Amino acid sequence: MTWVTIGLSAGTLLGMAIVVSGVFGWANKLFQVDVDERVLAVIDELPGANCGGCGYVGCGEYAEAVVLEKAEVTLCTVGGPSCAQAVAGIMGVEVSAVLPYRPIVHCGAHQEDRLGRNEYRGEMGCAAANLVTDVQGCTYGCLGFGDCSRACRFDALQVVDGLATVDYEKCVGCGACAKVCPRNIITITPFKTDRVLAVSCSNKDKGKDVTAVCNVGCIGCGQCARTSRLFKIENNLSTIDYEAYTADCLPEVLAACEKCKRQRLVFVGKPTPEDLEKTKDEELPDVVAPAFRTTVDDMEWRG
């Protein structure tokens, strides 16, 4: 191989590289999609959790929806009010006060409170157990196998003594727990105060049927509704009008709590200093981490 041949080869490759680069550059200009700079600015203000709590797949899609589709700027529960204000500033819109949304577990029955429980030997998940009859007497209450806990990316929900329990110090209100609950006992509710009242039951059967399957379930007696305008009995179950719920309602709410025979009206949310002081010496129940085992795992194979 002579230097002439080497030079021709190198020149040919260089020429091809220049041509291909030119083609790629032309194609890049031809097929370029202009991105609104506001989309990038909104993405920078979002927390990047990609939790889906806003109703979109991720932060990028939500940012595009805000800029291009005029979606609400207050949908990011992880970012909270400060994020909403920043996004509103980019979009040149005003935003009113943003209430934090948090989950409420509408069940208060721990293991010993549930009647009619039977041994379950299937897949240790709520979705699977919900397909099986006679897992427990109550067909409305928490199954306690932890689908909600596993769905939470912020470690804000654990199963304690068979009952899904929210850590409101960690919770950001993304709603992942509510989406995976097969019994729909978790609702995402606006918290007008750090602590709100909740009905910790979902059973819509008549009172005598409730007492047959649960020691603590709401029997729909109506005492709360007769005590406070915030309550209403619907389908044998006490409900709360959260639109009318404010801090000023506390006296009548406390009166209703005293009237509740089954003590199903409970306050949920961040603990107060008084609560922490009262419970500092109490021993906490064990946190249950369900094992993913079925009867097949314990089967002894022979042959």
Residue ranges of predicted features:
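Short recognition patches in nucleic-acid-associated and regulatory proteins
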Residues: 228-245
